[in-house]
């Protein structure tokens, strides 16, 4: 991530080149008293406003976690399927939590975060229960929405590790009905 201080009109802004959604983007930090003026100037230049729903859709299509929904202080990078985010230089060193991480890499985890595609357009939201084909509860959805890029509903959640393979058939309980889905 790169960032810097810039002057826009008569005020200072701090801009970082980043993107929380998987898209190229910028994050702008600005004094509150200039925020409305800044947005008005962007709109004059042709910018389009979006809301949290768009951000959520983009991040889910990209498979990105939302802290508090998909990951939290009790979730390890291995459970969240984020081992790739641990530097290769660091993975074998000692750091807070390294013993747990190393044990999970060696022995596996009980639950793991997966992407899920319901077979219908029904949207499975957070806390939707996930069942196997024998009707045993095996996990929960953490986030779900409609993905316009794939023209289908999408979700992510945690399932017991032995159900995490691609194309594993499972069922989501949405409003009292079981909906077929696949990893």
Where are these regions (language model features)?
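Conserved, structured C-terminal
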Residues: 1-183
């Amino acid at each position: 991530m790169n960032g810097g201080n810039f002057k826009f009109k008569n005020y200072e802004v701090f801009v970082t080149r980043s993107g929380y959604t998987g898209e190229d983007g910028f994050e702008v930090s600005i004094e509150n008293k200039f925020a409305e003026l800044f947005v008005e100037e962007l709109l004059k230049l042709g910018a389009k406003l979006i809301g949290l729903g768009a951000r959520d859709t983009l991040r889910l299509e990209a498979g990105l976690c939302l802290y508090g929904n998909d990951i939290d202080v009790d979730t390890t990078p291995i459970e969240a399927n984020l081992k790739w985010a641990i530097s290769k230089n660091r993975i074998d060193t000692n750091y807070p939590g390294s013993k747990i991480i190393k044990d999970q890499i060696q022995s596996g985890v009980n639950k793991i975060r997966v992407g899920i595609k319901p077979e219908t357009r029904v949207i499975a939201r957070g806390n939707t229960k996930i069942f196997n084909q024998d009707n045993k509860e095996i996990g929960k959805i953490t986030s779900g929405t409609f993905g316009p890029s794939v023209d289908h509903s999408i979700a992510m959640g945690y399932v017991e590790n032995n159900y995490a393979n691609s194309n594993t058939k499972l069922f989501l309980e949405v409003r009292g009905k079981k909906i077929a889905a696949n990893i």
